């Protein structure tokens, strides 16, 4: 197959950052996506509906397309209230709230210290139909970084699913076979996003032959057996799994340093990267469901009505891309992509 036409895709998990870099991140995310769910871990974090609407306006100021629409999310803290959830839902622009365990990832220091503290908030979310997005890692120092996801599933997420059976939950950027099994076995209100980089790479790519800082992300890349489980889930056609890039830009100097930031930038070629994975798995026919159908179906939103076309046509990814007054090194920098969006 050299040409593939699919319903216009959406990205259900992306970081655009804020300020002058929006000119670059919005350009990339809006190129062919219909919608993108914008993560709220900016500085300061987006903790109220007013902040979410103001952030949306800043994003829209750089949107040069007609088809793209940003969807907003709230950042949950120990101090989030049920009233704030109801207010956010009523705004019409905020579709989800994000649970970051405190310290789990970039700009998550304001996150939730104990999930029991936000049980009244989760109850309100269940009542009004607001989705819960979860960064599924524990942050206690006695848990190995490669085991954080599994421990979170057992100790934190399983009780939430049991206590709030009608709450729609998205386990974001899953990285383990354990997460795949958890989502498959959970009730119909539990789904997951999978990133392109966790499908394409494993920890060997990051660590063998020298440390590759641009592969460093959180949750961290796991061993290849987990990678294979993710590929199987993503390409299976199972409606519980859908596209969320977790594209997370950092300036080159912040990545290539003695204490580098976590995050990989993939928004420049997201659906093209996924197409390679699906082609290698012999499942290109399932790309449309993963990229364009399963996400809006789970969120209770209409599918996009128009299409995009991918063609098998190699093109070079630049060594770096503009990022405000700095540069970002994208995934596949200096290499060729196999698929291109016409």
UniProtKB/Swiss-Prot annotation:
Query: What gene is this protein translated from?
Result: pyrC
Q: Which organism is it from?
A: Vibrio vulnificus (strain CMCP6)
Subunit composition? Homodimer.
Q: Which domain of life is it from?
A: Bacteria
Entry's CDD domains? DHOase
A GO term, aspect molecular function: zinc ion binding
User: Which InterPro entries does the entry mention?
Assistant: Amidohydro-rel, DHOdimr, Dihydroorotase_CS, Metal_Hydrolase
Question: Which class of enzymes does this protein belong to?
Answer: hydrolase
Q: In which pathway does it act?
A: Pyrimidine metabolism; UMP biosynthesis via de novo pathway; (S)-dihydroorotate from bicarbonate: step 3/3
Q: Which cofactor does it need?
A: Zn(2+)
- Read off the Gene3D superfamilies from this record: Metal-dependent hydrolases
Q: Which residues bind Zn(2+) 1?
A: 13, 15, 98, 246
Q: Which residues carry this modification: N6-carboxylysine?
A: 98
| EC number of the protein | 3.5.2.3
The catalytic activity, as recorded, is: (S)-dihydroorotate + H2O = N-carbamoyl-L-aspartate + H(+)
On cofactor binding, the record's note says:
Binds 2 Zn(2+) ions per subunit.
Q: Which residues form the active site?
A: 246
- Name the positions where substrate binds: 15-17, 41, 135, 218, 250, 262
Record family assignment: Belongs to the metallo-dependent hydrolases superfamily. DHOase family. Class II DHOase subfamily.
One of this protein's GO BP terms? 'de novo' pyrimidine nucleobase biosynthetic process
Name this protein carries in UniProt: Dihydroorotase
Q: Which UniProt keywords apply?
A: Hydrolase, Metal-binding, Pyrimidine biosynthesis, Zinc
Question: What start-end ranges are recorded for coiled-coil regions in this protein?
Answer: none
């Amino acid at each position: 197959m050299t040409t593939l036409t699919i319903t216009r895709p959406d990205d259900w998990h992306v970081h655009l950052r804020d300020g002058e870099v929006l000119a670059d991140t919005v350009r990339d995310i809006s190129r062919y996506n219909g919608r993108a769910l914008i993560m709220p871990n900016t500085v300061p974090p987006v903790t109220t509906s007013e902040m979410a609407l103001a952030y949306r306006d800043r994003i829209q100021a750089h949107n040069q397309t007609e088809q793209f629409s940003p969807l907003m999310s709230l950042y949950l803290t120990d101090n989030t209230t049920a009233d704030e959830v109801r207010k956010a839902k009523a705004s019409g622009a905020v579709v989800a709230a994000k649970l970051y365990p405190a310290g789990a990832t970039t700009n998550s220091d304001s996150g939730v210290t104990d999930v029991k503290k936000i049980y009244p908030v989760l109850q309100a979310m269940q009542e009004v139909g607001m989705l819960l997005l979860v960064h599924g890692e524990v942050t206690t120092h006695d848990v190995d970084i490669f085991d954080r996801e599994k421990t979170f599933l057992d100790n934190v997420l399983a009780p939430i699913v049991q206590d709030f059976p009608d709450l729609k939950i998205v386990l974001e950027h899953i990285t383990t076979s354990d997460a795949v099994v958890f989502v498959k076995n959970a009730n119909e209100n539990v789904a997951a996003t999978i990133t392109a980089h966790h499908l394409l790479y494993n920890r060997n790519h990051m660590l063998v032959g020298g440390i590759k800082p641009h592969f460093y992300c959180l949750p961290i890349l796991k061993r290849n057996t987990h990678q294979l489980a993710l590929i199987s889930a993503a390409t299976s056609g199972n409606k519980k799994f859908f596209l969320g890039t977790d594209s997370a830009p950092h300036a080159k100097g912040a990545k290539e340093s003695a204490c580098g930031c976590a995050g990989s930038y993939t928004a420049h070629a997201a659906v093209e990267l996924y197409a390679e994975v699906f082609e290698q798995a012999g499942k290109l026919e399932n790309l449309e469901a993963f990229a364009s159908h399963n996400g809006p179906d789970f969120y209770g939103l209409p599918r996009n009505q128009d299409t995009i076309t991918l063609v098998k046509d190699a093109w070079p990814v630049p060594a770096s891309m503009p990022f405000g007054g700095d540069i970002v090194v994208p995934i596949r920098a200096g290499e060729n992509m196999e698929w291109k969006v016409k």
